[in-house]
């Protein structure tokens, strides 16, 4: 029989296989024909008629119609991501030994093993760093020689804005952004994805709720449809936030990436847990969480901004997508806590973007120059609502062309 397979990214291909074979045999054939990197057997989930196919069951048992298709969903293995923080800590050892003899030489050598530790290897905090490295020597010792060879190209972006390094830096940031947003869909792609998932037998309302709870991540949305939306995310999937709340927090989004850029290097070296855990304590991240929960379509723009200001953070997000989405899905603090966090974000934004806050977290007023007001008016003249225009304009760092492109890509046929 010939099985038609379709990915959530709209890729379609066919596999010839005996119906007596098991589902696992089909997965192995997909891996052999499409590549182990893109379709590993362990990461494949095959879905037909709204059900996940069991590995040990024969294909004929599912009565697959050759005119229909089987959805193939690939999840990334978690073993790859868990090794990253270990190698990052381990590779700090050679940089700290260099510091003790010559601080000047450390500046040239430290970035090569690990960009995350380069800013903190020169100050007097090298002793704790070396202690951390020596506490976990054995597991990653074999991989240490390979890591320095892979990362030097990204290091100049973090440590030096020299013009000669702009080309590799831009390309690396672009690749990181593509990795971080590869699983997300917006605009017309969103509508196509809704239709695609509905063809699996689900109602439109169910699909939209699942996509909302997963921040438009189609892989996760299908999992929610199959397994059920977790209880802590159901209210977020069903309840639509008031438009005022969206426009209230969004102008502070540039401060989110800027604050993260100034804190990431020092925090990741001292954190003993997950590389992204330090974000929980950042008021700016709490505001970002509120913004994204209210308007998930802004996530790609915010990731792009983070990629420009802090490629290292974007790399961590790309390597730990599931954990990052989980953190974004966590409930936002109550009104009192939000008010305090809003004040901190407003202060940070006031220095760089001219954002001023009025009241106790209920309304934020934005100070704009006449030129910025004209740009906002021009975007409104394209036919977009003022609230969405302000969101896009500030999320795109006041870049009028980028904001216009962002707005044109969005789907405004929602509630």
From Swiss-Prot:
One of its GO terms (molecular function) is RNA polymerase II-specific DNA-binding transcription factor binding. Residues 336-355 have a biased composition (Gly residues). It is found in: Nucleus; Cytoplasm. Coiled coil: none annotated. The modification Phosphothreonine is found at residues 155, 186. GO terms for cellular component: cytoplasm; cytosol; nucleoplasm; nucleus; proteasome complex; XPC complex. The modification Phosphotyrosine is found at residue 202. Pfam families: UBA, ubiquitin, XPC-binding. GO terms for biological process: cellular response to interleukin-7; DNA damage response; embryonic organ development; nucleotide-excision repair; proteasome-mediated ubiquitin-dependent protein catabolic process; regulation of proteasomal ubiquitin-dependent protein catabolic process; spermatogenesis. The keyword Isomerase does not apply. Residues 188-228, 370-410 form the UBA domain. The modification Phosphoserine is found at residues 160, 174, 199. The keyword DNA damage applies. Residues 274-317 form the STI1 domain. Residues 80-175, 334-355 are annotated as: Disordered. Keywords: Cytoplasm, DNA damage, DNA repair, Nucleus, Phosphoprotein, Proteasome, Repeat, Ubl conjugation pathway. Multiubiquitin chain receptor involved in modulation of proteasomal degradation. Binds to polyubiquitin chains. Proposed to be capable to bind simultaneously to the 26S proteasome and to polyubiquitinated substrates and to deliver ubiquitinated proteins to the proteasome. May play a role in endoplasmic reticulum-associated degradation (ERAD) of misfolded glycoproteins by association with PNGase and delivering deglycosylated proteins to the proteasome. Belongs to the RAD23 family. This is UV excision repair protein RAD23 homolog B. It comes from Rattus norvegicus (Rat).
